[in-house]
Amino acid sequence: MGQKVNPHGFRLGITSEFTSRWYADKQYKAYVGEDVKIRKMMSRGMERAGISRVDIERTQGRLRVDIHTARPGIVIGRRGAEADRIRGDLEKLTGKQVQLNILEVKNPEVDAQLVAQGVAEQLSSRVSFRRAMRKAMQTAMKGGAKGIRVQCSGRLGGAEMSRSEFYREGRVPLHTLRADIDYGFYEARTNFGRIGVKVWIYKGDIVQSRAEREAQEALQRQTRRERPRRGPRSGSSGTTQGGTEAGRAAARGERRGRGGGGGNAPAETPAGEAAATEPTAPVAEPATAAASAPAEAASAPAEAAVANTPEKAEE
């Protein structure tokens, strides 16, 4: 039954959020009626603005309205005249102080509501419904969507009997709760009657809510900017120059080779090797002295005997 239910309502609290955020006890009925009137007011006369959704948040004595649009310049108007008019109409309707925020949709190609509006506008302009659907699908897939389904229902092509046709590209898991499915619906008014356009766009699987994911992405961007730069590297091993004993010895050898001309000067022995060879010298000296003393004593009588030979006496 995944294709029968509204994807936004099916995933509330999992991957999607409420578009109306307020609490009411006895005034619940009045608040719901006001929300419906506010959204109808935003849709009338603002077809060219490309409004994706309207978020409403109520506090005590105040009302905040967030308009997500692909063309904020049309909603704001020249020098903010259109925004002031909308704010005045909302205050007259609700009788409360209204805070109006106009937010731009960064990637309108993968926004289901805006895609549905675009297809409906083409149908109203007598464009072939198959061409409009395929063009919208190609644009969404190039924009980063992982799957899309577009459905048109009504008197397609001016036929006497109404029917429904849909095209799908990629993967659109309608019954997977962790799937981020965006859904949009819009009606096209043609000479033959109204044609309903429905769009499902699959953007990937998520476990966290959308607000938590945006906060995490902002934190990652901030840590990338604050990451310190590393020092210069030398050699294939990736260690910094002078960071190890071998590196310092090699650097000293290079400096001596440059100064002595020709590079034949021997490199200094590392401090660790010199310390290891020093204790062996004093240990070997006493043994050498003891071995040489008897040899000198034995050679003394031999020299005296040579001196007393007849050849020496004749001389």
Curated annotation (Swiss-Prot):
Keyword Transmembrane set for record: no
Annotated Low complexity bias: 265-315
Chain segments carrying region Disordered: 211-315
CC terms in the record's Gene Ontology section: cytosolic small ribosomal subunit
Listed Basic residues bias regions: 222-232
PROSITE patterns for this protein: KH_TYPE_2 (PS50823), RIBOSOMAL_S3 (PS00548)
Domain KH type-2: 38-106
UniProt KW keywords: Ribonucleoprotein, Ribosomal protein, RNA-binding, rRNA-binding
HAMAP family in the cross-refs: Ribosomal_uS3_B
Entry function: Binds the lower part of the 30S subunit head. Binds mRNA in the 70S ribosome, positioning it for translation.
NCBIfam families: rpsC_bact
Protein name (Swiss-Prot/TrEMBL): Small ribosomal subunit protein uS3
Organism listed in the record: Frankia casuarinae (strain DSM 45818 / CECT 9043 / HFP020203 / CcI3)
